[in-house]
Amino acid sequence: MDIRFVLPSEVEQLARNVVTSFPSKTPAALLQNMEGELHRPDEGRYLGCFDDDGTLLGSILMMDFTLNVRGVMMPMGAAAYVSANFLHKKERVACTLLKVLMRYYAKQGTPIGCLHPFNPAFYANMGYGYCNENYLYQPKPSAIRSYGDKSGLSYARPEDRQEILDFYRAYAARTHGATVHHYMDPHRIFDMPYVVVCRRDGRLTGYFTFDFVAVDHYTDMYHDLLVPEMVYED
């Protein structure tokens, strides 16, 4: 067994492992950028577990974040797309990779590790615990109050990009539990189809992103309005 970073020539094995592990949750952009990431990592580095024949048994995306812990910005090592070869499930490949990842970050002096668990009990056995809660609100549109004045709202322009990023990172610097990632932050915000900003006297005071999600009512007239991110200061 060999544990090392995945090579660009092994991208097909890596893509197959990720898709068979997350068949409905693998973003198309992740697959499109995968080979480029193996040449020049931006989002993170893919660590792989190989057998003696060079078959990829499992993989994990190692990502470097900065996390606000009660006002102190700390480095954090994150695990994403923990994937096992479909023909090698239940062989503790994922467990082995996570242990290697945790030892790596411990040697780097990184005090915090995180991941988004498919099964919290599975990762609890490795020392992971719960962090801040993630709330999902589902109000009816009729329950959203209108204050009449929307003059400060506008769709974000390309020239607003850096100002919005600076606004988010200032928010992250004062908010416990917020994270910063040089690659993920702009993609999380600007890969959304709609970004709206709020200005007061010309100064940015907030922004949110949104999209329309189809609801299966056998007609294209029904949609949910999804707002994954809303950051504001007033």
For each feature predicted by the language model, list its residue ranges.
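Conserved beta-strand in the GNAT
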Residues: G48, T55-F65, M76-A78, S83, ...
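Amide-forming acyltransferase catalytic core, primarily the GNAT-like/NAT-type
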Residues: N134-E233
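Extreme N-terminal starter segment of soluble prokaryotic enzymes
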Residues: M1-I3
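A short, well-structured alpha-helix characteristic of acyl/acetyltransferase catalytic modules
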Residues: P8-T20, E159-A170
